[in-house]
Amino acid sequence: MSKSNSIFPVLFCAAGIYASFLTWALVQEPLTTQVWENSHKRFQCPNVIAVVQAVAAVCVGYFYMRAKGAQRNYGAIAMVRDYAKPLALISFTQSASSPLSQYALQYVDYLTYMLAKSCKMIPVLLVHLIIYRTTISRKKSVVAVLVSIGVTIFTIGGSKGKISGSISGSNDEHFFQKASGFLLLFLSLFMDGLTNATQDKMLKNNRVQMAIQNAETQDKKQQHKVFHTLTGAHMMFALNFFVAIWNIAYLLVIDRGQICNAHAMLKKDPIIVSYLLAYALCGSLGQCFIFYTLELYGSLVLIMITVTRKMMSMLLSIIVFGKTVNATQWLGIVIVFSGITWEALDKRREKKALEAKVQKSE
């Protein structure tokens, strides 16, 4: 799919991601933190939740493919077969990232965790540059750094006076715990970067292969292999298929107790099922917007939208509920919007220059 020059598709993608994140979070909080009436404990079964989420996303992804007409041109099973190795890698890094960051919270404070997650664009850039040798313009790199700095400042500004006490223990133990936490955060961010950059690379490589194939077809050259158009809907279906497999394997081989615990709680508190299904549905609908954005604009724009979500929610609260932000947070907001505005104006300038060049050639 060609990238649109209009700003409306990216605004549509951003609005869809923000809305789905908001509803998803509203269901996630009671599902995972509430002490249920009959079980007298929280539903702490992350891999069971991940399986339900992945299965729901596979189903929604399949219907998303059919709605786009992608299933007719390139079947879901054929896509899984053709891209099994990279899909298995991406789904593994995607499945491993969240647990690593959650384990890191045992050793670092929540602010450090939030700051690390605010800089997700940087590892994506580094994976593109170092592993895949992708050429990224200096302007796009500067925008990524500006957005990361802005979100970091915004997070620090909103967390003043809210940081809990430090980890107890001797200096050596404290250093070891902090080092362990930072290592886990680094691994989590690396997994995030590898996931997003590899998804991006798969879609871009497919577009190049399709362009070459179309050129060979027009020149009537012999084709050694037939390539099919890979869409965000294909990625959503296939990745969740593998995520489900990874988590089911983990539950069956390593943590069967989680299955027994989930079964016992669902039997005592069947209302959890409705929360679980609502959580899975909201997450699946959100993934439609996420993979649509990835298909149209790539991983850097997608990460830019997701890391600025909290900031956008705060701005909405200011407009609707009259909430206030401090000077430090306003500085972060200005930096983020300066970077985004600079990129938007630069793209508009490039578009006008291209149109003028086309008119001149005619």
UniProtKB/Swiss-Prot annotation:
What domain of life? Eukaryota
Q: What does this protein do?
A: May be involved in specific transport of UDP-Gal from the cytosol to the Golgi lumen. Involved in the maintenance of optimal conditions for the folding of secretory pathway proteins in the endoplasmic reticulum.
Q: What is this protein called?
A: UDP-galactose transporter homolog 1
Q: How does it sit in the membrane?
A: Multi-pass membrane protein
GO MF entries: UDP-galactose transmembrane transporter activity; UDP-glucose transmembrane transporter activity
Which GO terms of the cellular component aspect does the record hold?
endoplasmic reticulum membrane; Golgi membrane
Entry-linked InterPro entries: SCL35B1-4/HUT1 (IPR013657)
Disulfide-linked positions? none
Report the Pfam families cross-referenced here: UAA (PF08449)
Keywords recorded for this protein, A-Z: Endoplasmic reticulum, Glycoprotein, Membrane, Sugar transport, Transmembrane, Transmembrane helix, Transport
Q: Does the keyword Transmembrane apply?
A: yes
Q: Which family does it belong to?
A: Belongs to the nucleotide-sugar transporter family. SLC35B subfamily.
Write out the annotated subcellular location: Endoplasmic reticulum membrane
TM regions (residue ranges): 7-27, 45-65, 111-131, 141-161, 175-195, 234-254, 271-291, 296-316, 317-337
Task: State which residues carry a glycan (glycosylated).
Answer: N196
